[in-house]
């Protein structure tokens, strides 16, 4: 939906040279819509000039590229255009190399207005991208190049020094880009372009390099640290965690492959684990913790008891949890605050079922997102859990992929979920009815790799669709797609 104001703005930008000449004459209240239209339509000349002459202290992608009164399209839910992103960066560069942007034509109130360029919140879904769009990796590289070029570019034009601009970004780094990003962070110190990282994701990065980057980040800006595929173990984590703990405003910590299994204790391992726990107790603002693929069997109470405040998002995928871990979590202060819970890869079919049901009961009032992929839940366990599951009245997302459920079990789930008015997405498994010669109970690996009878599954999809229509729930997405943009990030809940 576009308003007349939007359509008029789009028409004004058709001739970019004329639009640029008109910018000084336009009321600054039009600049936000001008920016959105120029970004959407790839009007790169206008976009560059808008950034160059921006009349407000803040230019925020999250504010400008969302759905608005004039345009229902939310550009933040799409990958950004490479052309538009480059135009924004060029506009910033031009501003920094001009002591008084547009001084000859701009009203006095517009001079030096921009103080913060907030480029955070861009889509980062990890799926295959259109070649004309920019990934978070590309965005990191582009901003890093700008920082380095600003430092190496020599003196600005004669006159007063440029007013510094803080650039807030979400950074992605791996082995290949580490040295480049480190140079950019160093270059931004004392530079008119100050790089400020909100969310850091480091993949396959050695321990010493991770520490070096953390030391360069502003302690007041960082909101999330996400360390992936680093296989740190407790020893590596005990080296890194004190550098993470200095970020007192950190709200999200995502770690993986932390081995603290009490079944194979060692003196060094226990010392490292105790040190890790002590450092975790330093966080005062932590609301999300992800410990995927970490052996936490029988240790969850030690981990969560150290935290100063209740978590709202907890991801414990493939952590080999024991019944006592689930019982502790159900009784802990965290349960009543959980909005997002991921227990994927933990066997919930046997002695863990009752403790899991207790946890679900304890978090029913707040839970919005529940991920139970590959938890070995068959029809019997699902049906026994449905009375509690349907009490999660605010639940929006339910992930059940990789569980041995039949068509009958899925239909029962669909019928019972009608009472959950907020439910929007159910990621369900291929029903066991659609496999040929399936062993029982089927291992998760078989469910993920075995061939599906496409004709049977087509009938299943048609029947589920008819049931959704009949129950007035056609707006709810039932899908087997685990790679789509369905799972919500904690900060978007």
From Swiss-Prot:
Q: Report if keyword Phosphoprotein is assigned.
A: no
Q: Where in the cell is it found?
A: Cytoplasm
One Pfam family named in its UniProt record: LRR_6
GO biological process: what's one of them?
negative regulation of NF-kappaB transcription factor activity
Q: Name one GO molecular function term.
A: kinase binding
State whether keyword Repeat applies.
yes
Q: What's its job? A: Negatively regulates Toll-like receptor-mediated NF-kappa-B signaling by disrupting IKK core complex formation through interaction with IKBKB.
Family the entry assigns:
Belongs to the PRAME family. LRRC14 subfamily.
The identity of this protein, by name, is: Leucine-rich repeat-containing protein 14
